From Swiss-Prot:
Positions that bind 5-amino-6-(D-ribitylamino)uracil: F22, A56, F57, E58, A80, I81, I82, F113
Protein known as: 6,7-dimethyl-8-ribityllumazine synthase
Transmembrane segments: none
Natural source organism: Protochlamydia amoebophila (strain UWE25)
GO molecular function: 6,7-dimethyl-8-ribityllumazine synthase activity
Gene this chain is encoded by: ribH
Active site as annotated: H88 (proton donor)
Family of the protein in this entry: Belongs to the DMRL synthase family.
SUPFAM superfamilies: Lumazine synthase
Source species, domain of life: Bacteria
Catalytic reaction annotation: (2S)-2-hydroxy-3-oxobutyl phosphate + 5-amino-6-(D-ribitylamino)uracil = 6,7-dimethyl-8-(1-D-ribityl)lumazine + phosphate + 2 H2O + H(+)
GO biological process: riboflavin biosynthetic process
Enzyme Commission identifier(s): 2.5.1.78
Keyword Cytoplasm: no
Amino acid sequence: MKEYKGKLNISKARIGIVISRFNETITKNLLEGSLDELERYGISTQNLPVAWVPGAFEIPLIAKQMALSGEFDAIICLGAIIRGTTPHFDYVASQSAAGILNVSLEINLPVVFGILTTDTVEQAMERSGVKMGNKGREAVQTAIEMIDLTDQLSLLRNHPHSSTANNTSVCK
């Protein structure tokens, strides 16, 4: 059996971040955690593009524009959606997730879902690093791992004996 696992050892990754201004106190914590984690892995944040959008619902469009630029190995999407008293939470959370997934699959690029979906502000604060873990840090780790894994699999795809390299398809 041949296993493929992404490794957390990329220091030259080109990463862009899309972040929601809504719930900015929380999203700034996520961004800070992401930037700290990027530096920890040796990825400079000095010229790192960070695109601020009004809310989580707008994240997929800007993530797609960044992905289509060809300038990035991965896009990290950060936001915080907190349940209120209306069904708005459900729509925004599900459509933001679906949009981010669609961008990743359409563009064939890691687009990481780093959007908190919580019932309370307290839960969001906890997950943004105020009391314990920071999901922004985890999003960076996911991006780095997925960059490495997709690189490994693209090398496999370009191998002379692969069905893709021979212009044949396993699925008919």
